C-alpha cells in the first residue's frame, strides 16, 4: 500500500509539470492581445511573434 501512495504522488507531480497541462495565461504573457496557436497561424491570421515553445502569436490583420 505504501508503494501505491508513492506512485500516485509521482503521477500527480508529473501531471503538474507537463507542458501540455500548463496554464494558458503564461503563454499570453508573451503574446500581447493575440492568441497562441501551435505551429503556424491559421490562414485568416498573421504571425506577429512567438509564444512559449513551438506556438505562434497570431493576430487579426487589422489589429497588428
Curated annotation (Swiss-Prot):
GO terms for biological process: defense response to bacterium. Residues 1-28 form the signal peptide. SUPFAM superfamilies: Defensin-like. Keywords: Antibiotic, Antimicrobial, Defensin, Disulfide bond, Secreted, Signal. InterPro entries: Defensin_beta-like. Transmembrane segments: none annotated. Expressed in circulating heterophil granulocytes and bone marrow (at protein level). Pfam families: Defensin_beta (PF00711). GO terms for cellular component: extracellular region. Belongs to the beta-defensin family. Antibacterial activity against the Gram-positive bacterium Staphylococcus aureus. This is Antimicrobial peptide THP2. The lineage of its organism: Eukaryota, Metazoa, Chordata, Craniata, Vertebrata.
Amino acid at each position: 500500500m505504501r508503494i501505491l501512495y508513492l506512485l500516485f504522488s509521482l503521477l500527480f507531480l508529473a501531471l503538474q509539470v507537463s507542458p501540455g497541462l500548463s496554464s494558458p495565461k503564461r503563454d499570453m504573457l508573451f503574446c500581447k492581445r493575440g492568441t497562441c496557436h501551435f505551429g503556424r497561424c491559421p490562414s485568416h491570421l498573421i504571425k506577429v511573434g512567438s509564444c512559449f515553445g513551438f506556438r505562434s502569436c497570431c493576430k487579426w490583420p487589422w489589429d497588428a
